[in-house]
Amino acid sequence: VEAIASGADLVAQSTHKSVGSLTQTSWLLGQGDKINQRRITQMHQMLQSTSPNYIFLASLDMARHQLATEGKALISRTVELSLYLRHELNKISGITTMEYIDIQERVVNYDCTKVLIDAKALGLTGIEFERMLREYRIEVELVQAHHVLVLITIGDTKESVTSLIQAVQAISDTILHTSKVANSNVVENAENLSKDSSLLPKPIVRVTPRNAMYANREQVPLRDALHRIAGETIAYYPPGIPCVAVGEEISSSVLQYIENRKALGYVPNGADDMSLETIWVLPVSYTHLR
């Protein structure tokens, strides 16, 4: 069910992921009388470049035209490929995909073109599964404790979907043949780490982002950063939301979140030290600000 058809006022659609426009492009769709178009335009003008990229705009228009003239056939074929992929993956030992029946009591519907592949029964964490798929030249959309998400789009073909099926089959065969299925405790631990770090308390802002950005900083071991003021913003994807932003106090919850993510194999965005053995903080004098 389309968001607009469901009555949404504003919808951001990432056309570059599923429709075929160039990377970085998307649409903001709106309907109804609740939208202040003048306000939206004002905000848009504040954020956008004064020199828009007309190649990007042209790609959006081409994507729009393609949907208008071929959309029904393209989407139907994409859905068929997605269902075929799900059917074939569920035949593979140690592999399952999340289906509507698994979540129907909690949702109105689901997008079958977003295929969540679970490798828990093979003893793989999501990060390990992602790395193994990369050896077959397959990139996934995102990873979590023990699964990966792949997107099937109008650009996919029977050949590309078959390549994914064959890669997953090969990974399953390799693990089961060599009896390298990890101890169930490993995956269970990954699940627990993911759950434990899913929610963080409301951050405490000690210094405004602007003042913090221009303040002197020092680099300290992560273990010594408790209650210090962050001098850099740290985020993991997923969810793509900072666990601590510049100017915020680094709490014990944040430190635990970072340690959990490190244990799962995630690489942070925004960190100067990608290993996060160290972190930039403001001088101790800022710590006493209340």
Model-derived features with residue positions:
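PLP-dependent enzyme catalytic core of the Aspartate aminotransferase-like
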Residues: 132-135, 141-285
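Conserved active-site and cofactor/substrate-binding residues in soluble primary-metabolism enzymes
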Residues: 6, 21, 35-38, 51, ...
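Conserved small-domain helix->loop->beta segment predominantly found in fold-type I
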Residues: 73-149, 154, 176-203
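Short, glycine-/Ser/Thr-/acidic-enriched flexible segments
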Residues: 17-18, 33-35, 62, 120-122, ...
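Conserved small/polar residues in nucleotide/adenosyl-binding loops
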Residues: 287-290
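Short acidic (Asp/Glu) and glycine-rich catalytic loops that position anionic groups and cofactors
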Residues: 37-41, 59-68, 108-113, 142-148, ...
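Conserved PLP-enzyme active-site core in the AAT-like
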Residues: 1-94, 98-99, 119
